[in-house]
Amino acid sequence: MTEQKKTTIGITGMTCAACANRIEKNLNKLDDVEANVNVTTEKATISYNPESTSADDLTKTIEKTGYGVLNETAELDVIGMTCAACSNRIEKVLNRTDGVDQATVNLTTENATISYNPSATSVDALIKKIQKIGYDAQPKKEVAEKSSQKELELRSKLVKLIISAVLAAPLLLTMLVHLFGIQIPSIFMNPWFQFILATPVQFIIGWQFYVGAYKNLRNGSANMDVLVALGTSAAYFYSLYEMVKWLFNANVMPHLYFETSAVLITLILFGKYLETRAKTQTTNALSELLNLQAKEARVLRDNKEQMIPLNDVVEGDYLIIKPGEKIPVDGKIIKGKTSIDESMLTGESMPVEKVQDDNVIGSTMNKNGSITVKATKVGKDTALASIIKVVEEAQGSKAPIQRLADVISGYFVPIVVGIAVLTFIIWIAFVQQGQFEPALVAAIAVLVIACPCALGLATPTSIMVGTGKAAENGILFKGGEHIERTHQIDTVVLDKTGTITNGKPVVTDFDGDEEALQLLASAEKGSEHPLADAIVNYAQTMNIKLLDTTDFEAVPGRGIKANISGKNLIVGNRQFMNDENVDIKDSEDIMTQFEKSGKTAMLIAINQEYRGMVAVADTVKDSTATAIKQLHDLNIKVVMLTGDNERTAQAIANEVGIDTIIAQVLPEEKAAKIKSLQTQDKTIAMVGDGVNDAPALVQADIGIAIGTGTEVAIEAADVTILGGDLLLIPKAIKASKATIRNIRQNLFWAFGYNVAGIPIAALGLLAPWIAGAAMALSSVSVVTNALRLKRMKL
């Protein structure tokens, strides 16, 4: 009898003991299963017989009951992939593995991202699965470490290329004889000389192609290595056969193809070297983000200052940062004041004043004051680390546009081998009957011109460069699907407060004398209302001395009453003044004017006498009007969503040029309003910054979070714009359009190259070495085209 297996599964969605009991009951109905579900720990402890019940059965039972299984994500560096057929093969094997929810393998980044159930499989088991099909894998390395590894790989490829080129160059001269009849020294035509030069290229330099081909064929698949190994081996061994015949009849000089095999391998190595070199440039955005980090920190330990590596800083450490130094980690100022350049995060060039208890962000620059900071977030929890993580995930993700290329790549190599065999048969049977050499040359040309690499690189390289360029501009796409969908947007919905406006009310107008302002600010200083803060701040900038208040009373929906230094103050709306019998007829015109401008106007009366008026408004961001104009230039409709009344909303809409307003919307109604717009066949982007925007961000086709907003909004969004600059919204759409256009160009070239190249080779119109050169350069051209995105202007 099989021994019972024990596992623990994390469960999401449980709210009470009844949930746990329901899951437990359904699990225990399975054969040979004993389950215990704990609602507090949100875990199920299960003993089961793997012969009668699989780990997947357990997961499906929990999900059918209406709850979720908590998966973990593994990120692996995959070693040994050469083309799209490799990445597709690994992806298929991983997705068929028990316990794996979803796996994606990216040829460009050479990464695998796997969502899996830890109760059913493990990272070690996943690595073994990859190794079993002929590749290698390891837990993902840090960007800096991987970058240095890539440099070593590039150097190794260059050495191989140089050796191969030195050996193949003399053989290339023999082509001049075949093509143009040019006379060269007889040594170059000697079969032994050609054999000695071609053999190390074929079996030492080119051994990697044999290893790759063997591993793939052993596992029932085929990749680029199979095509190269078949094509070059056919040329090499046919030449060897002709050479052996020559040994027995030295009077007849054989027609050898040693130069074909050696030059083909050299050209393919050259293409792979250029491709690797270009691919390293696609990760520059990540390297540049990493370079923003401080390398070390000045920490206060045992009452002594000491410099330590950044990685040694722990939460709770006290850091001393001097003028001109980078803030090492996220933290809170506990001593000192300064101004900080946060442009790397917000794009705002003006330094921000910081005082005690203010938060600071790691990697920003301290400008002019010494400060002591308590570390609150270190390592992978810092703001910059989060940004790097988002960019990495986006660069490693797949866009839906890639699906067709993935499907074709899976069948590509077997089809090409079939076409090569068919070409050989047609040539030897019909085109040049009984002539072996022309048939072989045409078949070799078909094998070596076909390039699955270009298909595999077409989308991910563009995604990598596009998301990297966007990140440099403060735009974070969370994945390839989001960068693809963003270019389809035709309507942008903007939340008003904190998105269109600064989110902080200020006094815009004051009509009254100094005493009225003094009493007004004195009464408001104890209030927590945002409008009160605006009034107090205004009075302080005017150097008004605040007085003590007695008998303060807030009247809901009306205003406030207070007694200050024996004077009775009344502040509020028209109705309040009428209730208190204050004559306000002189204020009507100016108050109406303020309200039409979207401002909140408050009347001031002292001892029953009207003394003035204050207008407070949440001011519009400087960039809002320009951003909306740019969206209109892109033929995108702009809608404002706000809880304000119609008149206030319309005033702001008129100021910034917004097409449509949806006013008096409660926070919980925002998602429903987005859904209503979607029923009109609109592709909606919702832009917001607050907790109450999160449901609407999720409902929208694309949710865009303002980076200065709450973590909840940022988590719910598909795109994050760092800082509060709305100009980044049209830039995000432009980046998406440029990236998708670039992907389409790459796919057109990759498909077009193979569709045109294979028939031309089959017709015998291409020499194998020319076909090989075309194949080598096709993938390089795709990567080079993607690199053009680095120069796109947003």
UniProtKB/Swiss-Prot annotation:
UniProt: Mg(2+) binding residues: D689, D693
Binding, Cu(+) 1: C16, C19
Subcellular compartments: Cell membrane
Positions of the HMA domain: 5-70, 72-138
One example of a Gene Ontology biological process annotation: copper ion homeostasis
Catalytic activity from the UniProt record: Cu(+)(in) + ATP + H2O = Cu(+)(out) + ADP + phosphate + H(+)
Gene Ontology cellular component annotations, sorted alphabetically: plasma membrane
Keywords, ordered alphabetically: ATP-binding, Cell membrane, Copper, Copper transport, Ion transport, Magnesium, Membrane, Metal-binding, Nucleotide-binding, Phosphoprotein, Repeat, Translocase, Transmembrane, Transmembrane helix, Transport
Lineage top rank: taxon: Bacteria
SS bond list: none
Principal localisation: membrane
Single GO MF descriptor: ATP binding
Binding annotation for Cu(+) 2: C83, C86
One family name in Pfam for this protein: E1-E2_ATPase
Enzyme Commission no: 7.2.2.8
Signal peptide start-end: none
List of catalytic residues: D495
Membrane topology: Multi-pass membrane protein
InterPro entries the UniProt entry points to: ATPase_P-typ_cyto_dom_N, ATPase_P-typ_P_site, ATPase_P-typ_TM_dom_sf, ATPase_P-typ_transduc_dom_A_sf, HAD-like_sf, HAD_sf, Heavy-metal-associated_CS, HMA_Cu_ion-bd
Role noted for this protein: Involved in copper export.
Similarity comment: family membership: Belongs to the cation transport ATPase (P-type) (TC 3.A.3) family. Type IB subfamily.
Name of this protein: Copper-exporting P-type ATPase
Species annotation: Staphylococcus saprophyticus subsp. saprophyticus (strain ATCC 15305 / DSM 20229 / NCIMB 8711 / NCTC 7292 / S-41)
Gene for this chain: copA
